[in-house]
Amino acid sequence: ARPTTDFAKENIFNVLNGYIDFEDAVALDLFSGTGSITLELLSRGCSQVISVELDRDHHRFIQECLNKLTKVEGQRSAVIPIRGDVFRFVKSCKQQFDFIFADPPYALKELPTIPDLIFEKNLLKEDGIFVFEHGKDYDFSQHPHFVEHRSYGSVNFSLFKSIV
């Protein structure tokens, strides 16, 4: 596992403030790992976050964090944790999102196909934003939905929007 660094996460969310108001947004966190982005989205006021992670231990960790939050706040979290294959989830998902974050393993051979898949399945609402974390060896600047690229050390983010 290679979690998004705190430095990179803080910086990308500062950039995102110019794109989206997270208050009451519906978000999707793909390849959610330990749930760091999921919890960040929750803390920023998202009304619902669907978190998709295949790894059993990571999924269990997210569940435990949510259970602790529920005990502290006295209400059920707005997070829906799903343990499953991200590609299978995306292909069958009928919901649209204001915000999508994907942080696949950098060595994943299907990594370059993910932006196309997100838009083919129409998962992003009008004016929604998709943030894709990837290694430095990838360049998505020619993608029709690409809006900008940010790099923080070895962590790279490509931002995409729906074309209206």
Region roles according to the model:
Residues 1-164:
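Class I S-adenosyl-L-methionine-dependent methyltransferase catalytic core
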